[in-house]
Curated annotation (Swiss-Prot):
Sequence intervals crossing the membrane: none
Listed Gene3D superfamilies: 3.30.230.10, 3.30.70.240, Elongation Factor G (Translational Gtpase), domain 3, P-loop containing nucleotide triphosphate hydrolases, Translation factors
HAMAP family in the cross-refs: EF_G_EF_2_B
CDD domains assigned: EF-G (cd01886), EFG_III (cd16262), EFG_mtEFG1_IV (cd01434), mtEFG1_C (cd04097), mtEFG1_II_like (cd04091)
GO cellular component, one term: mitochondrion
Coiled-coil stretches noted in the UniProt entry, renumbered to this chain: none
Encoding gene, per UniProt annotation: MEF1
Localization (cell): Mitochondrion
Residues of the transit peptide: 1-64
Protein name, as recorded: Elongation factor G, mitochondrial
Binding residues annotated for GTP, in chain numbering: 105-112, 192-196, 246-249
């Protein structure tokens, strides 16, 4: 490195903002939602123990939902001081060998195939079975019959396994080198998640409770639409991740192009920690460029790992080049390594490995592994990487809130100590053979079979009759589960996102983000309605927060809503298979919305006199556009600015209720209203005639009066569509997207195929699957995910408004 380059690097480091500096310099708590999407939220340095005196100054508010404004308010108020529990030596030893990991990716990247190999190499299953049930068995984690038929994961599945790996880099003692220590046994909880966007809630709730993740990418397709969604979800919950480039044996595989996409499309500081030996069909193994060793899988199923210092000459230059690149990229994320790099000091494999662990845990860096799960290559080194670089439960600072304090009160750090008061989060519900199965992450304390626990939301005290650890659809009964573990309970009635305690605290945890449905359709049984029809709908609603059911007030039809056509099709099929209820469905309906584009004032009086006590309520204020809150997902709000009491306090909730009722049905097309804030400034009441009904109706009338003055528009869901097809069909594919009024965002050509990314209204995408198959001779495929709601064209809005008006007049 030249003197000029060294000087420039030092200046760059000095001029870096706090959010860009390596983590060891950054000690302030950071709220995740204050960061832009492309910036990695921070976590505290591993140098800060969860039990150290400096912990309260350095902890990251991982699950805090309060805003930065709330922090300012907290300085002016005095909050109760709490003595944090302390980890015992037994706790520390147990937690150092614990990992909670999710496996996520775009559909068909090989997540379930990878998980199957992980289970085989860790000894959890005796043989390897393939996705789609080609061998009449199917992958272990795809336990549902529909999953094996369609070859996709529909529900997330949990399991646990033990893996023997070298000691993590941060635990190395004087004289020890990375990878050459006595091996330790690690306990790994694994959740395999769906890759299809329609089942995104499964990814959402898995990442909510995990400490780390493996982001799987296809060596050919690279970063795809759902990869971007999964990355966004990982950032939302501050989940450190490793990347695994799978399918290295496929024709056209190019791992370094994929790493370029990680940096470009995901704004991720990523670099390879391995390089491939051979390519495509000649892919034979990898070179670990941290330790500069060649690694091969031998044996029929890749059981035997062979490590050697003899790196093939064909890849030696590449390995040295990528090692230099790794050190340079990693130096931007870790100050210790940066100093060695700038001083041109010798950098050992241990220096690199320790920097990787610090930078990965702090969300500053993503190590990239590579292999081929289907060819049983590169999976064991990935498991070693999970144990070496991803955090254990004591290195992730989770937060709870005290339900007895205001929402802006400081959050309480949870310590994964066994003897601490119990705090756990129910993150997934499932109807099992023996009743409701509730998946739980224990954050603090110990959960015992037969113990009494409290639901923080309902206040109810319930008994835990049975406690199990899950292995896909199999269960292993246990007597107790301690902090840092994932388990399941039978016979406990609750909802997804509920917090459970032992009753000694009033703690509650924030739930997971639940996206709004984008598509609906009517549904009815083929014959007479049976109890099973309602039973199935109730169960599916309870299990899946993105699956909604309501009865249309006009047609009296039962309407189901979800994240896409496949999402709803799966539930219709499950009703037939699991409840013996064949259903007839109507044409899919798009989830249109209405909103306002500017603020409008109202001064509305509701007055009714018909003898005796009447109704009187006057409200003054405004409605204004509102952006979606990135933390809660809410895009409507009610704000009371009344000072003095012109409207008695007991009537304020009625006004808020009236506002919520008015949102249910828009005035242009009858669709729900979104993106709107109701501000109450003033009003008046009558000593006799004012009541809750009067103010509720006044709020509805005021909202409707102001809505028409606020330049309302109709919104429609717009999807990000990604199409992959042979290059000879590019013109036809682009023409079809233009025909559907789509906006082309990006095109990429590689070898003999191309990828097109476009934004198209969901209402214009019906029937596209058949059209694409026809125009590409069955060789094209596409995926789409919800992007946002955007205004429809003015002429479309006019047609929709006219149709709605005629429908109203015909009643």
């Amino acid at each position: 490195m030249s003197a000029i380059a060294r000087a420039a690097a030092r200046v760059r480091q000095q001029n870096t903002t706090p959010l860009q500096r390596p983590l060891l310099l950054q000690r302030k708590p950071v709220l995740t939602h204050t960061l832009p999407l492309h910036a990695s939220p921070l976590k505290p340095s591993l140098a800060t123990s969860i039990t150290s005196p400096n912990f309260q100054q350095s902890f990251q508010r991982r699950w805090a939902s309060a805003s930065a404004k709330a922090e300012e308010g907290a300085k002016e108020e005095v909050w109760p001081q709490r003595k944090l529990p302390e980890l015992t030596e037994t706790d520390k030893l147990r937690l150092r060998r614990q990992r909670n990991v999710g496996i996520s990716a775009h559909i068909d990247s090989g997540k379930t195939t990878l998980t199957e190999r992980v289970l085989y190499y860790t000894g959890r299953i005796r043989d390897i079975h393939e996705v789609r049930g080609r061998d009449a068995v199917g992958a272990k984690m795809d336990s549902m019959e529909l999953e094996r038929e369609k070859g996709i994961t529909i529900q997330s599945a949990a399991t646990f396994a033990d893996w023997v790996a070298p000691k993590p880099p941060t635990e190395l003692k004087e004289g020890e080198t990375v990878g050459n220590t006595d091996k330790q046994k690690f306990a790994i909880n694994i959740i395999d998640t769906p890759g299809h966007v329609d089942f995104t809630i499964e990814v959402e709730r898995a990442l909510r409770v995990l400490d780390g993740a493996v982001l799987v990418l296809c060596a050919v397709s690279g970063v795809q639409s759902q990869t971007i969604t999964v990355d966004r979800q990982m950032r939302r919950y501050n989940v450190p991740r490793l990347a695994f480039i799978n399918k290295m044996d496929r024709a056209g595989s190019n791992p370094f192009r994929v790493i370029g996409q990680l940096r470009g499309k995901l704004k991720m500081n990523a670099a390879a920690v391995q390089v491939p030996i051979g390519s495509e069909s000649d892919f034979a193994g990898v070179v670990d460029i941290v330790r500069m060793k060649a690694i091969y899988n031998e044996g029929v199923k890749g059981n035997q790992i062979v490590e050697t210092d003899e790196i093939p000459e064909s890849v030696r230059a590449l390995a040295e080049e990528k090692r230099a690149e790794l050190i340079e990229q990693l130096s931007e994320a870790d100050e210790t390594l940066c100093d060695l790099f700038l001083d041109e000091a010798p950098i050992t494999p241990t220096d690199i490995a320790q920097a990787l662990q610090r930078a990965t845990t702090s969300l500053r860096f993503t190590p990239v592994f590579m292999g081929s799960a289907i060819k049983n290559t590169g999976v064991q080194p990935l498991l070693d990487g999970v144990c070496a670089y991803l955090p254990n439960p004591s290195e992730v600072q989770n937060q709870a809130m005290d339900a007895t304090l205001p929402a802006h009160a400081p959050t309480i750090p949870l310590v994964p100590a066994t003897d601490a008061p119990l705090v756990g989060l129910a993150f997934k519900l499932e109807e099992g053979r023996y009743g409701q199965l509730t998946y739980m992450r224990v954050y603090q304390g110990e959960l015992k079979r037969g113990s009494m626990i409290y639901n923080a939301r309902t206040g109810k005290r319930v008994k835990v009759p049975r406690l199990v650890r899950m292995h896909a659809d199999e269960m292993e009964d246990v007597d107790a589960v301690v902090a840092g573990e994932i388990c399941a309970m039978f016979g406990v009635e609750c909802s997804s996102g509920d917090t459970f305690t032992d009753g000694s605290s009033t703690y509650t945890m924030t739930s997971m983000f639940v996206p709004e449905p984008v598509i609906s359709l009517s549904i009815r049984p083929e014959g007479n309605e049976t109890p099973n029809f309602s039973r199935a709908l109730n169960r599916f609603q309870k299990e899946d927060p993105t699956f909604r059911v309501h009865v249309d007030s006009e047609s009296q039809e039962t309407i189901i809503s979800g994240m896409g056509e496949l999402h709803l099709d799966i539930y219709v099929e499950r009703m037939k298979r699991e409840y013996n209820v064949a259903c007839v469905t109507g044409k899919p309906r798009v989830a249109f919305r209405e909103t306002i584009t500017e603020a409008a004032k109202f001064n509305y009086t509701h007055k009714k006199q018909s003898g005796g006590s009447g109704q009187f309520g006057r409200v003054i204020g405004s409605i204004e556009p509102m952006e979606t809150d990135p933390d809660t997902g809410k895009d409507t709000a009610f704000e009371n600015r009344i000072i003095g009491g012109n409207i008695p306090n007991q009537f304020i909730p009625a006004i808020q209720k009236g506002f919520q009722e008015a949102l249910d049905r828009g005035l242009i097309t009858g669709h729900p209203i979104t993106g709107c804030k109701f501000v109450l400034d003033d009003g008046s009441a009558h000593a006799v005639d004012s009541n809750e009904l009067a103010f509720r109706l006044a709020a509805i009338g005021a909202f409707r009066e102001a809505f028409n003055k606020a330049r309302p528009v109709v919104l429609e869901p717009v999807m990000t569509v990604e199409i992959v097809a042979p290059i000879e069909f590019q013109g036809n594919v682009i023409g079809a997207i233009n025909q559907r009024k789509g906006t082309i965002v990006d095109t990429e050509v590689r070898d003999d195929e191309f990828t097109l990314t476009a934004e198209v209204a969901l209402n214009d995408m019906f029937g596209y699957s058949s059209q694409l198959r026809g125009m590409t001779q069955g060789k094209g495929e596409f995926s789409m995910e919800y992007k946002n709601h955007q205004p429809v064209l003015p002429n479309i809005q006019k047609e929709m408004a006219e149709a709605f008006r005629k429908k109203q007049l015909s009643k």
